[in-house]
A protein has these predicted regions:
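Core catalytic alpha/beta fold that binds nucleotide/phospho-ligands
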Residues: 1-167
Length: 167
């Protein structure tokens, strides 16, 4: 419900959201949104926040993560060797890094909208030092072998990180 309200506020009118077979949301053509204005839509939420990102065309990805979550499972499941190498020994910094890496990979996953993605092998986030906002450098290796470089914007909101990518 909060997402529909956000979309209506963003477009200053009632807007229809539909979902593709893979669950990816999109904004519908119609009186509310003429064909030339078709927008990609990505949605994320936690208990406290809901967020959306739109972009022309069909690619947009956003994720939101609460920092109170235990991200150690992420380190085992979703990080590649090159990402594990730059993780801090400081627990607080490590948590911020893991949260941002996971958030970035979820945003890339939504952006690419491909099935059966191996988060540890097909997606990489370049080394970084966590700030309150910034841009991460991500790569996504598609199943056809083509690698895309993706700039991932991020912002810290209280005890959450939000990461988004559009293109």
């Amino acid at each position: 419900m909060a997402v529909r309200v956000l979309v209506d506020i963003l477009f200053d009118r009632h807007t229809i959201i539909q979902y593709r077979d893979n669950g990816k949301p999109f904004l519908v053509h119609g009186k509310e949104l003429p064909e030339k204005e078709l927008k990609a839509l990505s949605i994320a939420h936690t208990r406290r926040f809901a967020c959306i990102v739109t972009a022309p065309g069909d690619k947009a990805g956003i994720d939101l993560e609460c920092l109170s979550r235990n991200f150690e499972a992420v380190a085992k499941k979703a990080l590649g060797k090159e990402e594990k190498v730059f993780l801090s020994d400081n627990l607080q910094q490590r948590t911020l890094q893991l949260a941002l890496i996971w958030c970035a990979k979820e945003a890339m996953f939504k952006y690419m909208s491909q099935e059966e993605v191996d988060f540890s092998k097909q997606m990489t986030v370049a080394p970084f030092f966590p700030e309150t906002e910034g841009v991460l450098s991500g790569t996504f290796q598609q199943q056809n072998g083509i690698t895309l470089l993706l700039p991932l914007c991020y912002k810290k909101l209280d005890d959450h990180f939000m990461v988004w990518v559009t293109g």
